[in-house]
């Protein structure tokens, strides 16, 4: 069954709603240029009240290693998601399992993926304006090729309307959504979250 991560969590209410809807993981953004950015203290307060067995993921972009490792300990993160140009050596120095994000323009965006030895690979649409959360899709054929490198988490423009098609076509390890289930910036829509998770988990992949 496909795993589902709801990213850009900013409140206890949204966190608990996503968990109750069946989310496997919650994402917290530690990037001050994102509209979904949280201070570590804010995230820690939300994470503290989560039930067990929910994976907590911290998203970072070009952050100093010391900052990442400090936040992982303070917030008790399970996984770190790196969205910048961090090399394998940097990933290896992070004190948690790492998901490395690749922003996909075309097939050449996978050229350096074989240099990484990480827990998973997140594929998102390339944008000149943002590192994720853009609501833009990319050619899913690229994701099929990327599966040979390890567990693939599909992101980029996913919504309740297209997630079943994406899962059926790519059969990824997981899917990741942020803007696609929002009612407004920083606010999740409960019905969209419920539909997204239900459709992602009910669909059987083709591969």
Curated annotation (Swiss-Prot):
Coiled-coil regions listed: none
Domain of life: Bacteria
Known pathway: Amino-acid biosynthesis; L-tryptophan biosynthesis; L-tryptophan from chorismate: step 3/5
Record-listed E.C. numbers: 5.3.1.24
Record-level GO BP terms: L-tryptophan biosynthetic process
Presence of keyword Amino-acid biosynthesis: yes
Any GO molecular function: phosphoribosylanthranilate isomerase activity
Catalysis: reaction(s): N-(5-phospho-beta-D-ribosyl)anthranilate = 1-(2-carboxyphenylamino)-1-deoxy-D-ribulose 5-phosphate
Alphabetized UniProt keyword annotations: Amino-acid biosynthesis, Aromatic amino acid biosynthesis, Isomerase, Tryptophan biosynthesis
Similarity comment: Belongs to the TrpF family.
NCBIfam families referenced in this protein's UniProt entry, alphabetically: PRK01222.1-4
Name by which UniProt lists this protein: N-(5'-phosphoribosyl)anthranilate isomerase
Organism of derivation: Geotalea daltonii (strain DSM 22248 / JCM 15807 / FRC-32)
């Amino acid at each position: 069954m496909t795993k589902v991560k709801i990213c850009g969590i900013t409140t206890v209410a949204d966190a608990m709603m996503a968990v109750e809807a069946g989310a496997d993981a919650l994402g917290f953004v530690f990037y001050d240029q994102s509209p979904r950015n949280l201070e570590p203290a804010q995230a820690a307060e939300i994470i503290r009240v989560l039930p067990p067995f929910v994976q907590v993921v911290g998203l970072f972009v070009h952050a100093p290693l010391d900052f990442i490792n400090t936040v992982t300990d303070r917030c008790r993160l399970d996984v770190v998601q790196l969205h910048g140009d961090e090399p394998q050596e940097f990933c290896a120095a992070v004190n948690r399992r790492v998901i490395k994000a690749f922003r996909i323009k075309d097939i050449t965006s996978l050229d350096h993926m074989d240099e990484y030895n990480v827990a998973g690979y997140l594929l998102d649409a390339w944008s000149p304006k943002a590192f994720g959360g853009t609501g833009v899709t990319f050619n899913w054929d690229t994701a099929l090729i990327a599966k040979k490198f390890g567990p693939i988490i599909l992101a980029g423009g996913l919504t309740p309307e297209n997630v079943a098609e994406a899962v059926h076509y790519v059969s990824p390890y997981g899917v990741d959504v942020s803007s696609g289930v929002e009612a407004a910036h920083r606010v999740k829509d409960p019905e969209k979250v419920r539909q997204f998770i239900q459709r992602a988990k009910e669909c059987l992949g083709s591969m």
